[in-house]
Amino acid sequence: MTSRKKVLLKVIILGDSGVGKTSLMNQYVNKKFSNQYKATIGADFLTKEVMVDDRLVTMQIWDTAGQERFQSLSVAFYRGADCCVLVFDVTAPNTFKTLDSWRLEFLIQASPRDPENFPFVVLGNKIDLENRQVATKRAQAWSYSKNNIPYFETSAKEAINVEQAFQTIARNALKQETEVELYNEFPEPMKLDKNDRAKTSAESCSC
């Protein structure tokens, strides 16, 4: 049986400060939730080994700070990402409105090879709270308008849909990683113009 190389998937979680990015990450990786809120300074990551379609992969999940003043630190963290998770708080409409700018920010900073088809996943978090302000249909419509991004409604506190969401994140990230590998293995052939072809023919002539 041939051993397959270990796959490391880099996942970036973006969204405004306080939407629950760190809580979602901790719930998924450590099965823990804390009511004590502490803003993430800069960026931090956790890793978790998961099975994706009978393949063992390591997910490296990056939690990037939501405050504007830390965004300049994030450029290096965006690079090499295999999937981007956009998180908003269903009780705070402003955090939903900024999803557009977070998505654009990622595409600019990460510069993925195929931005049109890069895998995003949207999470509407804190559905355990009663004062909901962003309707499911509104979030679904936004996600659909952005190349049909998968959308999940989650609660980091109650562990609702967290596992399911990250399974989709892992699967889409693995697909992205595989496509990049194939692209690197079979790069586009070089195109020669007429002068180059004539020069090549002359150089290979043994007369």
Swiss-Prot record:
The modification Cysteine methyl ester is found at C207. Its EC number is 3.6.5.2. It catalyses: GTP + H2O = GDP + phosphate + H(+). Its cofactor is Mg(2+). The modification Phosphoserine is found at S72. It is a peripheral membrane protein. The keyword Transport applies. A lipid is attached at C205, C207 (S-geranylgeranyl cysteine). The modification N-acetylthreonine is found at T2. SMART domains: RAB (SM00175), RAN (SM00176), RAS (SM00173), RHO (SM00174). Keywords: Acetylation, Autophagy, Cytoplasmic vesicle, Endosome, GTP-binding, Hydrolase, Isopeptide bond, Lipid degradation, Lipid droplet, Lipid metabolism, Lipoprotein, Lysosome, Magnesium, Membrane, Metal-binding, Methylation, Mitochondrion, Nucleotide-binding, Phosphoprotein, Prenylation, Protein transport, Transport, Ubl conjugation. Mg(2+) binds at T22, T40, D63. It holds the Pfam family Ras. GTP binds at residues 17-23, 34-35, 37, 40, 66, 125-126, 128, 156-157. It is found in: Cytoplasmic vesicle, Phagosome membrane; Late endosome membrane; Lysosome membrane; Melanosome membrane. A motif (Switch 1) lies at residues 28-41. Its main location: membrane. GO terms for cellular component: autophagosome membrane; cytosol; late endosome; late endosome membrane; lipid droplet; lysosomal membrane; melanosome membrane; mitochondrial membrane. Regulated by guanine nucleotide exchange factors (GEFs) which promote the exchange of bound GDP for free GTP. Regulated by GTPase activating proteins (GAPs) which increase the GTP hydrolysis activity. Inhibited by GDP dissociation inhibitors (GDIs). GO terms for molecular function: G protein activity; GTP binding. Deubiquitination at Lys-191 and Lys-194 by USP32. InterPro entries: P-loop_NTPase, Small_GTP-bd, Small_GTPase. Interacts with NTRK1/TRKA. Interacts with RILP. Interacts with PSMA7. Interacts with RNF115. Interacts with FYCO1. Interacts with the PIK3C3/VPS34-PIK3R4 complex. The GTP-bound form interacts with OSBPL1A. The GTP-bound form interacts with RAC1. Interacts with CLN3. Interacts with CHM, the substrate-binding subunit of the Rab geranylgeranyltransferase complex. Interacts with C9orf72. Does not interact with HPS4 and the BLOC-3 complex (heterodimer of HPS1 and HPS4). Interacts with CLN5. Interacts with PLEKHM1 (via N- and C-terminus). Interacts with PRPH; the interaction is direct. The small GTPases Rab are key regulators of intracellular membrane trafficking, from the formation of transport vesicles to their fusion with membranes. Rabs cycle between an inactive GDP-bound form and an active GTP-bound form that is able to recruit to membranes different sets of downstream effectors directly responsible for vesicle formation, movement, tethering and fusion. In its active state, RAB7A binds to a variety of effector proteins playing a key role in the regulation of endo-lysosomal trafficking. Belongs to the small GTPase superfamily. Rab family. This is Ras-related protein Rab-7a. It comes from Oryctolagus cuniculus. The lineage of its organism: Eukaryota, Metazoa, Chordata, Craniata, Vertebrata. The gene is RAB7A.
